[in-house]
Each structure stands twice: as structure tokens, then as C-alpha cells.
Regions:
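Histidine-centered nuclease catalytic patch
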Residues: 54-98, 109
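Short coil/turn linker and secondary-structure boundary residues
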Residues: 2, 29, 93, 112-113
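Charge-dense, low-complexity polyampholytic segments
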Residues: 49, 121-124
Length: 137
């Protein structure tokens, strides 16, 4: 498993490549500001998903054990990284409106559910499910 600092170094490169003025420009004036927000947020969230409170390292371990599936996209693989999610989808990508979410919660929450409702009713169960997978032989 990568140490936190090595993981963060790789993630900062990855997240910098995802910055788009069109998509993120409202809340982040440039790529460096976006990357700095990401670094501060991932540390504040202790490398855990905002919704299910599961460590990205536990999620990566489950992926490596083939207990969780990933999804290939045109820009990489969804699953082994925390993703930038808008708490209120109708609002833009701003520091106040964004959190880091695992792929599984982000995909599940989609644009349909309120972030706090999702966190309360689904996040806790997702965490229990991940714990179940960790203990499953």
C-alpha cells in the first residue's frame, strides 16, 4: 500500500490534469488553486470519503482483492481514487460546495439526492457494506 504522502503526490498530479476552467473556473481561479483545495480537503477528511467515511486505502485494498469492481473511463479508472463531488448539484464547483467522495458513493448519490440526506441514510450503510467485504473470506 502506498504511504499517504506518496499517494497524495500522485493524486495531486491526477487532479491537476482534471482541472477545467469551464467546469471549475467559477470556484477555482486556476489549476494550482484547485490542487491546493484538493490537498487540504483530502487531509481534512483524513483520506476518507465524505459520505461513507471509508478510507481510500481500504477501498483500494478491496479493489485489489477483487471484492469491489472499478469502471474504466476515457480519463482513467473510477474506483481507486476519491472524486470531487458537488454537495448541491445545481451549484457549481466551489470550495464551499465540493467534497471528496469515493466513486461508489458519488455514483450512487448522482445528481438526485441531497448530500446530507445521502450521507445520513446511505453513507452509513455503504460503510457497513465495505466492512462486511473487508471481513469476508
Amino acid at each position: 500500500m502506498l504511504e499517504k504522502e506518496d499517494f497524495l503526490k500522485n493524486e495531486k498530479v491526477r487532479i491537476g490534469k482534471l482541472y477545467s476552467t469551464k467546469k471549475h473556473g467559477k470556484g477555482f481561479s486556476n489549476k494550482d488553486e484547485f490542487v491546493k483545495w484538493f490537498e487540504n480537503t483530502i487531509k481534512a477528511q483524513d483520506f476518507k470519503c465524505y459520505y461513507c467515511d471509508t478510507s481510500i486505502f481500504d477501498i483500494c485494498s478491496l479493489i485489489n482483492q477483487d471484492k469491489l469492481k472499478t469502471r474504466k473511463t476515457g480519463y482513467g479508472t473510477r474506483g481507486p481514487n476519491l472524486e470531487v463531488d458537488r454537495k448541491i448539484n445545481s451549484n457549481g464547483y466551489t470550495k464551499e460546495n465540493c467534497v471528496l467522495s469515493c466513486y461508489y458513493c458519488n455514483n450512487d448519490k448522482s445528481y438526485i439526492l441531497d448530500s446530507e440526506v445521502y450521507k445520513k441514510y446511505f453513507g452509513e450503510n455503504r460503510k457497513k457494506y465495505f466492512e462486511y467485504l473487508k471481513n469476508k473470506k
